[in-house]
């Protein structure tokens, strides 16, 4: 938006698969894209009312495989048949850890792999190569399936445990941003909480939950059913139907 203002533009158009609508009272709504397999509204929760008013999604009602590629071919675009990226588009080789190391200018430091009882069971070549819920490529051989249950960046340790250790009933989140009108959302929040569909992973189906504010000021999302492998640092986004209400950054999982 700073770039839009600096250039004197009225709107920014982006190729994300999402859509907006304006209510009779002038407020804006951010919706999921028409194609559920391509929907990218999860990544756009930080678009506030002011930002939504100046954002256009030209692909909102188009199907990528048929409409978008056809239009691109008709216009002579050389990338009309280019294979799409399933992951981070600017890391072509998929080596996320290597990308971070190159950006930081040094290799990740090795550290301990710790079992649930506190005993060191192995060594890792960089904690950034592990994610909560990971089962393969751990570098540790045990007689039964084990999973990454935590990554302690401050102490450079990776923690392992059983599948049951990944289960949580709720999560906390900070840096919360409302995409829906903030005053209305805050009013609902203080009147007993907000029933939402929540996603803490991009490809995840909506999980029924209640959103409240905890005593520490963080958002508290309590799920109807136990959840698995909630990872701090991930975005959590809440919906009402196909409308994005807002989101924040996961800070922890609660049993």
How should these model regions be labeled?
Residues 1-244, 249-255:
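Nucleotide-activated chemistry modules centered on ATP-dependent adenylation/adenylyltransferase
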